[in-house]
């Protein structure tokens, strides 16, 4: 199906929810400990999250420019194809479909199951793997049936993920006790630890480019996509920094 025959049904809030929702996931849970360990000090850990988000800003600005110039489904495949690199475009599409997205989806599903298993031990082992498969199939079927329904689902699921974080942040600010800010730095922790901390944030800031893969589904993509991409990185940056 060509992009001209697509019915553009999604707006800014769907784009923002998809960008934020695909970014804020298992990354913050998996990476937070790695960032703290690599940084060695709370101040360096917080700074690492800030720098990691700042580094992501130029990336999303480039994506915003490309998505505005070529508002078609396909993301990198379209951009490389338009640049005249058709073999590289094919390799990008092939690698994304077979090598990049499936492991990412599997990791996120297994992360959900792992956290559920801490409350419900039944989901340890084969039962957990089956639950992970079921989660993937259910979410896939929702998006397959309707683009608009998929967008609405993404708004809801993103809100469900973000609200608990906001509650933790608000409660932390309300009951802040500066006596708890005393800490013992990890031996050998120096400013050079910042590099390791920033590197550990990389996984947590990936995902915003997901909306570029479906640029042909958005109404007025020239305005919606840049606003959604830039807003999403700022929201995620603020969220991660406050959680750190």
Task: Label every PLM stretch briefly.
Residues 1-33, 37-43, 56-64, 72-73, ...:
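Membrane-interface "cap" regions at the ends of multi-pass membrane proteins
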Residues 2-7, 42, 46, 123-127, ...:
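Helix-loop-helix junctions that connect adjacent transmembrane segments
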Residues 9-19, 45, 85-98, 131-135, ...:
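Select transmembrane alpha-helical segments in multipass membrane proteins
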Residues 20, 24, 47, 51-55, ...:
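Lipid-exposed faces of alpha-helical membrane segments in multi-pass integral membrane proteins
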Residues 20-31, 102-106, 202, 206-209, ...:
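Short helix-kink/termination motifs in transmembrane helices of multi-pass secondary transporters
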Residues 29, 60-63, 109, 113, ...:
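Alpha-helical transmembrane segments of polytopic integral membrane proteins
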Residues 34-37, 57-136, 140-144, 149:
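Hydrophobic transmembrane alpha-helices that form the core helical bundles
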Residues 148-156:
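Interfacial loop-to-transmembrane-helix boundary motif in multi-pass membrane proteins
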């Amino acid at each position: 199906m060509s992009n001209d025959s697509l019915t553009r049904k999604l707006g800014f809030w769907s784009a923002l929810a998809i960008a934020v929702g695909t970014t804020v996931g298992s990354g913050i849970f998996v990476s937070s400990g790695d960032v703290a360990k690599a940084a060695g000090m709370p101040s360096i850990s917080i700074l690492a999250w800030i720098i990691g988000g700042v580094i992501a800003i130029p990336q999303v600005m480039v994506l915003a420019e490309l998505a505005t110039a070529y508002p078609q489904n396909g993301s990198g495949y379209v951009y490389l194809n338009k640049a005249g690199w058709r073999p590289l475009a094919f390799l990008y599409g092939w690698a994304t479909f077979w090598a990049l997205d499936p492991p990412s989806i599997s990791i996120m599903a297994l992360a959900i199951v792992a956290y559920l298993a801490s409350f419900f031990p039944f989901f340890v082992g084969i039962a957990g793997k089956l639950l992970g498969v079921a989660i993937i199939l259910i979410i896939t079927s929702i998006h397959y049936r309707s683009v608009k329904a998929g967008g609405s689902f993404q708004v809801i699921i993103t809100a469900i993920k973000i609200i608990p974080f906001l509650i933790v942040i608000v409660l932390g600010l309300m009951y802040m006790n500066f006596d708890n800010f005393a800490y013992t730095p990890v031996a050998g922790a120096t400013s050079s630890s910042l590099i390791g901390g920033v590197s550990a944030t990389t996984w947590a800031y990936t995902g915003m480019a997901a909306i570029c893969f479906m640029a042909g589904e958005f109404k007025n993509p020239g305005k919606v996509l840049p606003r959604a991409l830039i807003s999403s990185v700022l929201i995620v940056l603020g969220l991660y920094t406050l959680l750190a």
